[in-house]
C-alpha cells in the first residue's frame, strides 16, 4: 500500500507539473507570437518584397540596356551604310567630273588644233599670194628692163641673179 500511495502521489505530481508546463508553454507561445513572430514575419515579408522589387528592377534595367544596345547597333549600322553611300556618291561625282574635264580638254585641244590648222593654212595662202605678187612684180620689172635694153647672155644672168638676191632679201 505504501507503494500505491507513493505512486498515486507521484502521478498527481507529474500531472500537475505537466499542466503547469503546458500552460507556461502556451503563454510563452502567445507572447512570442505577439512580440516576436509578427515583427519577424513582417520583416521577412518586407525583405521578400524588396528582393522581388530588386529582381524586377534588374530585369527592367537589363531589358532597357539590351534595347539601348540594339538601338546603338542599328544606329552604328545605319551610320556605316550612310558613310558607304557618301563615299560611293563622292566616287561617282569624281568620275563624272573627271569625264567632264577630259571631254572639255579634248574639245579645247581639238579647237586649238583646228585653229592652228586654219592659221597655218592662212599663213600658207598669204605666203603664196605674196610670192605670186613678188613673182608678178619681178616678171614685170624684168620684162620692162628687157624691153628697155637688149642684154647679152652674161648681162641677163647677172640681172636675174640680182633680182633673185633682192627677192631673198625682201622675204627675209
Swiss-Prot record:
Record field: compositional bias (Basic and acidic residues): 63-74, 116-131
Cell compartment(s), UniProt: Cell membrane
Lineage per the UniProt record: Bacteria, Bacillati, Bacillota, Bacilli, Lactobacillales
Subunit and partners: F-type ATPases have 2 components, F(1) - the catalytic core - and F(0) - the membrane proton channel. F(1) has five subunits: alpha(3), beta(3), gamma(1), delta(1), epsilon(1). F(0) has three main subunits: a(1), b(2) and c(10-14). The alpha and beta chains form an alternating ring which encloses part of the gamma chain. F(1) is attached to F(0) by a central stalk formed by the gamma and epsilon chains, while a peripheral stalk is formed by the delta and b chains.
Protein name: ATP synthase subunit b
Source organism (scientific name): Limosilactobacillus reuteri (strain DSM 20016)
Swiss-Prot/TrEMBL keywords: ATP synthesis, Cell membrane, CF(0), Hydrogen ion transport, Ion transport, Membrane, Transmembrane, Transmembrane helix, Transport
Region: Disordered, residue numbers: 63-131
Record-annotated membrane-spanning stretches: 12-32
Family as reported in the entry's similarity comment: Belongs to the ATPase B chain family.
Originating gene: atpF
Membrane topology: Single-pass membrane protein
CC terms in the record's Gene Ontology section: plasma membrane; proton-transporting ATP synthase complex
Major place of residence: membrane
GO molecular function: proton-transporting ATP synthase activity, rotational mechanism; proton-transporting ATPase activity, rotational mechanism
Protein purpose: F(1)F(0) ATP synthase produces ATP from ADP in the presence of a proton or sodium gradient. F-type ATPases consist of two structural domains, F(1) containing the extramembraneous catalytic core and F(0) containing the membrane proton channel, linked together by a central stalk and a peripheral stalk. During catalysis, ATP synthesis in the catalytic domain of F(1) is coupled via a rotary mechanism of the central stalk subunits to proton translocation. Component of the F(0) channel, it forms part of the peripheral stalk, linking F(1) to F(0).
Amino acid at each position: 500500500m505504501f507503494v500505491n500511495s507513493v505512486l498515486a502521489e507521484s502521478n498527481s505530481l507529474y500531472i500537475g507539473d505537466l499542466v503547469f508546463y503546458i500552460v507556461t508553454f502556451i503563454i510563452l507561445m502567445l507572447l512570442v507570437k505577439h512580440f516576436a513572430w509578427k515583427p519577424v514575419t513582417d520583416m521577412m515579408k518586407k525583405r521578400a518584397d524588396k528582393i522581388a522589387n530588386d529582381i524586377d528592377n534588374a530585369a527592367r534595367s537589363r531589358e532597357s540596356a539590351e534595347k539601348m544596345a540594339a538601338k546603338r547597333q542599328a544606329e552604328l549600322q545605319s551610320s556605316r551604310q550612310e558613310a558607304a553611300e557618301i563615299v560611293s556618291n563622292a566616287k561617282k561625282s569624281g568620275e563624272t567630273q573627271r569625264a567632264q574635264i577630259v571631254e572639255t580638254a579634248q574639245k579645247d585641244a581639238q579647237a586649238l588644233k583646228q585653229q592652228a590648222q586654219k592659221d597655218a593654212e592662212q599663213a600658207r595662202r598669204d605666203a603664196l599670194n605674196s610670192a605670186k605678187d613678188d613673182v608678178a612684180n619681178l616678171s614685170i620689172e624684168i620684162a620692162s628692163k628687157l624691153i628697155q635694153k637688149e642684154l647679152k647672155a652674161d648681162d641677163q644672168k647677172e640681172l636675174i641673179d640680182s633680182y633673185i638676191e633682192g627677192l631673198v632679201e625682201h622675204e627675209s
